[in-house]
C-alpha cells in the first residue's frame, strides 16, 4: 500500500490516503470478475450422466438413489452459493470411511482448482475465521469431526447454517456483511460424530465409502480424475439451468 500511495502522489499529485483508497475501490469494483463463475459457465456437458456413479467410481460408495441425491444436493448448493451468494445451504456432505481412501483428495479435486479448496479451518471461535473462508469454494472439515463432542458438533451445526459473515477488513471503516460463497464437506473414519437427535442429524449427509469397491483410485490418474469431475460439474450446471432441482 505504501508503494501505491507514493505512486499516486508522484504521478497524480494525490496525497489523501482516504481518496486514493476510495479510488482504488471504485476501479476494482468496475473491473471485478468471478473466476469460479467463469469456469462453470464455460463447461459443456457431454450428455453422459456421472453424478450417480461419481462416488462409486472414485471411492466405492453404493451407486444408489440416496448417494446420488446427496451428491447432487451438495453440487447444486455449491453452484447456488457462487451465482447467488448467501443462498440457503445448511448441510454438510460427509464422506465416511477408512484412512487413505481419498476422501480429502476428492474434495480437493472437486473444487476444480486447488486454491479454491481449503482444509485449514480448525477453530470456529477464532475472530479471524473469515480469513479461512475468503477465496475458497469447498472447505473440508476433517479434524473437527474426528475430535468431535456434543458441544463441538452443535458449534459446527450452527456455523454451517450461516449465510453470511460480518467483519471489517483493514482498509474499511465499518464492518460489512459478506454473503457466503462456500460450502462445507466433512470426512471421518466413523459415524461417531453424528448427533443422536434428528434435528441435529439433518445437517450432516453421511455417505459410507468402500475404497476396495472403487473403480479407480482418485490419484491413479489425476488429470483423468479432474476431467471426470469437470463433467460432473457440467452435468450439475445443466440441472441448475433447467430449474428442475430446488
Say what each PLM segment does.
Residues 9-34, 88, 115-119, 125-152, ...:
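Feature primarily recognizes SF3-like P-loop helicase cores of small DNA viruses
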Residues 24-134, 138:
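P-loop NTPase catalytic core of nucleic-acid-dependent motor ATPases
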Residues 1-9:
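Non-catalytic nucleic-acid substrate-recognition regions in nucleic-acid-modifying enzymes
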Residues 107, 156-157:
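Short amphipathic alpha-helical segments and helix-helix/interface helices
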